[in-house]
A protein has these predicted regions:
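Glycine-rich adenosine-cofactor-binding loop
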Residues: 4-23
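NAD(P)-binding Rossmann-fold cofactor-contacting core
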Residues: 26-48
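Phosphate-bearing ligand-interacting subdomains
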Residues: 43-105
Length: 216
């Protein structure tokens, strides 16, 4: 009988619960994970239940374990997710799970970095590169030869066309689109429903059709 690997989900919020559901969907087809519970640095959540799983403590608990520990960071904010992962770099026992919903359509010519999460209904085509700790939420598409940087968050129903380059820690809002071959600089935020028709070369928040930068 296959031995299940213990898994902790960092982030006991709404997306964390969605990832717990994703884990259950994986296990229904191929038993892989023993979901031990959630990790969250909000002490008010400790010793509570989320989606039937305990919030066992903060991130410092992970470092107290001597055995290899699989975790995945289910925090939507790209920058907060990066801060959490950077905080855990000193813990040699931590291994990052990569979770892909069974409904995802993905070619065998896709490179996926550790700690990434790909949610139900997504399609990733050929010769795509996904960095580490990327979140691709429900019903997204990623076209041929696209490169998605580390810690990128794609919210539901994002469409990224072929040969697009998305920099580290970019957030792509719900329902937005990027036309073929465009580049988005690291740390940019594209608002929900926006359409990127030219390169985004400066950090900032962009909204509209086509998107333009929000000036403070």
């Amino acid at each position: 009988m296959k031995t299940l690997k213990d898994l902790y989900i960092i982030g006991a919020g709404g997306f964390g619960r969605e990832v717990a559901w994703l884990v259950r969907r994986i296990n229904e087809l191929s038993p892989t994970w023993n979901l031990v519970g959630f990790i969250d640095d909000d002490v008010r959540k400790h010793r509570t239940l989320e989606d039937g799983y305990p919030v066992v403590g903060g991130t410092e608990l992970l470092g107290s374990r001597t055995e290899d520990t699989y975790v995945v960071c289910a925090v939507g904010s790209a920058h907060i997710r990066k801060l959490i992962v950077d905080k855990l770099k000193g813990y040699s026992n931590i291994k990052y799970a990569t979770l892909i919903d069974p409904s995802v359509i993905i070619s065998d010519r896709v490179k996926i970095g550790e700690g990434s999460i790909i949610c139900a209904g997504t399609i990733v085509t050929v010769d795509v590169v996904l960095g580490k700790h990327v979140i691709i939420n429900l019903d997204c598409t990623v076209g041929h030869d696209a490169v998605i940087g580390n810690f990128v968050t794609m919210y539901p129903s994002v469409n990224v066309s072929g040969m697009v380059r998305v920099g580290e820690c970019v957030e792509l809002g719900t329902g937005m689109q990027v036309i073929q071959g465009k580049k988005i600089v690291e740390n940019a935020i594209i608002g929900a429903g926006g359409v990127v028709v030219k390169d985004i070369l400066d950090e900032g928040t962009y909204v509209g059709i086509p998107v333009s930068k929000c000036e403070k």
